[in-house]
C-alpha cells in the first residue's frame, strides 16, 4: 500500500553502494524508516529529498518491516543550516534527541511542528543555543521525565523559586532550598525562563536575547537533569560541546 506524508529527515545510513536507509519524522505517521534505493547516485530523483534535515513530501510503500521511499518533493531544504557547521551541529543534536526519544510509527503532530519550527528558526538565523534549550525543555514530557516547574516540588508553594533540585526533580522555594544542599541556586529570571520554555507556543517566539551567564545556567541545569534521568549519552551533544569549547560560533551573528 502506498502512503504520502510530510516529513523531516532526521537520520541517514548508507546501505550498499547506492542505497540509503532514511529515518523520517512525519506529521502523519510519526517516525518511520524507509529504504531509498539509488539515493546515493548523484542523478537519482531521491538524492536531494533524502539529505539530512530536508523537509519534504514523501511518497512511500509501507511493508511489514522497512518501508520503501518511491518519490519525494522538497518543501524546504534548510540550506542556511546545512551550510553552517555550528548551526548544523545544533540541528544534529535536536534531530538526534528526537530520534532517541520517540517510538516508531507513533503519531505526534505537536512534536512534528516543534521540530519543524526549531529548525526553521535556526535556518532564519535566530539564536540556536536558546532554541535548543527551549526544545530540550519541551521534550521533557516526551522523555517521561518532566520536572516540577509550576510550584515548589517539596511544599507545593507557588512562591518565586530560588533553586532547582536535580534530586527532587523541580523547583524549590526559599523555605525548602535546604532540603537539597546540591540544588542549583537560580534567579527569578531563570525560573521564569524554564517555566516559559515549557509552556509557551514556539510559533509565537519573537526576538529573544539572553546574557551568556543566563544561557550557561540554563544549559547546565537542563543537561544535568537529562544526564540524571534520561539515560541518554548522545555523541551529537558531545560534538556540539567540543565546538563551543574550541571557540566556534554561529556565523549568522558575524
UniProtKB/Swiss-Prot annotation:
Q: What is this protein called?
A: DNA repair protein RecO
Where is it found, in Gene Ontology cellular component terms?
A: bacterial nucleoid
Q: Which organism is it from?
A: Halalkalibacterium halodurans (strain ATCC BAA-125 / DSM 18197 / FERM 7344 / JCM 9153 / C-125)
Tell me which NCBIfam families the record gives.
Answer: reco
Asked whether the UniProt record includes Mitochondrion among its keywords, one would answer no
| Segment forming the signal sequence | none
Keywords in UniProt for this one? DNA damage, DNA recombination, DNA repair
Asked if Transmembrane helix is a keyword of the record, the answer is no
Q: What does this protein do?
A: Involved in DNA repair and RecF pathway recombination.
